[in-house]
Amino acid sequence: MKPYLTTSDFEKLGYELKKPDNFGKLLKSATVLINQICSYYDPAFAYHDLEADSQADPDSYLFRQAMAFKKAVALEMLFLEDSGYSSAYDVAQGALNSFTVGHTSMSLNPSAGQNLTVGSTGVVKSAYDLLGRYGLLFSGVASL
C-alpha cells in the first residue's frame, strides 16, 4: 500500500512535526484512524486512487477532495504527535473522569483529547469536519 502522504506532501501543506523522525509511525497511526471513517481512498476498497486524484486538474473537484484528504491525514498526524496518543483506545483511556478508593474520591477534568476528537473514533474534529465538507466520510452500515 502506498502511503497517503510523503514528507514532501506534508511540508507542502505547510505543516511541520516537532520530531520529524516520527513521521512514519504517526502516518501509520493516522492512516488507521482516518480509514475507519473514510474508505474513499482505502486501497482495500479501491474506490479512488489518491495519487491520480492529486494529479488531476487543480480546478477539479477530484483534486480538491484529494487535497482535503491529505490535509485531514496531516491534521490527524499533528494531533497524534501533540497528544501523545496512537490509537482510538489511547484517546478513550484518557477519558477517565473520576475514581474512588475507599473513602477518597477524586474528580478529574475530561481529557482534552476526548474533547478534540469525534466520538470514540480518535479522529480530531478538524480532520473529521474537513472530510465531511468534501463528502469523504463513510456513511454506510459498518456492521450488522
Curated annotation (Swiss-Prot):
It comes from the Viruses. Belongs to the Lactobacillus delbrueckii bacteriophages ORF4 protein family. This is Uncharacterized protein ORF4. It comes from Lactococcus phage LL-H (Lactococcus delbrueckii bacteriophage LL-H).
